[in-house]
């Protein structure tokens, strides 16, 4: 999570947290982290876990809440994209990375419903300030075609970038 350093405060929402690797990393930085997943609970100091299926039509479990950071990796449920935009507080950072079309050459996911179209994250988060965007083949940890974006709710001049 190369851009995690741009998250300067909590609370941070880890969507589809899986084993909790990102939640743990962010909690180690001192942030209050809310991890949500339909699977087994994630635990650790600074981590609150909410068990929820985000795809079954239930209401968004965090209605009215805003987050200083939102992290989503290896997960795509398109109806959540505008909800994530609404859930990001002023000055907040959203980091999203998942597979895109072309990944079927390397393995799963291969169903187009679970693969982003070229530039799709740019479109989905166009109301926010783009800090960084990448799409293409990654070699590690396993070869895959991915798309990743880091966006900010606020002016671009408030982000410190590396030279």
For each of these PLM feature ranges, what is it?
Residues 1-9:
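Conserved alpha-helix/loop element of class I SAM-dependent methyltransferases that forms part
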Residues 13, 19-56:
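Class I SAM-dependent methyltransferase SAM/SAH-binding core
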Residues 138-163:
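Core SAM-dependent methyltransferase catalytic element
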Residues 113-127:
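Short alpha-helix
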Residues 67-81:
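A short SAM/SAH-binding and catalytic strip from SAM-dependent methyltransferases
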Residues 92-99:
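Conserved beta-strand signature within the Rossmann-like core of class I S-adenosyl-L-methionine
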Residues 59-69:
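A short acidic, Gly/Pro-enriched loop at the edge of an enzyme's catalytic core
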Residues 88-89:
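Helix-to-beta-strand junctions that scaffold the AdoMet/dcAdoMet cofactor pocket
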């Amino acid at each position: 999570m190369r851009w995690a350093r741009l998250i300067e405060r909590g609370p941070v929402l880890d969507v589809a947290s899986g084993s909790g690797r990102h939640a743990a990393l962010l909690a180690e930085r001192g942030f209050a982290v809310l991890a949500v997943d339909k699977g087994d609970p994630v635990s650790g100091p600074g981590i609150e876990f909410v068990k929820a299926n985000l795809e079954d039509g239930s209401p968004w479990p965090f209605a009215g809440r805003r987050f200083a950071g939102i992290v989503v990796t290896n997960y795509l449920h398109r109806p959540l994209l505008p909800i994530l935009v609404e859930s990001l507080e002023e000055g907040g950072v959203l980091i999203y990375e998942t597979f895109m079309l072309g990944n079927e050459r390397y393995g799963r996911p291969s169903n187009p419903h679970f693969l982003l179209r070229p530039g799709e994250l740019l479109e989905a988060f166009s109301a926010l300030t783009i800090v960084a965007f990448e799409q293409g083949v990654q070699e590690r940890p396993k070869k895959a075609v991915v798309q990743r974006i880091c966006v900010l709710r606020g002016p671009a001049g408030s982000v410190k970038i590396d030279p």
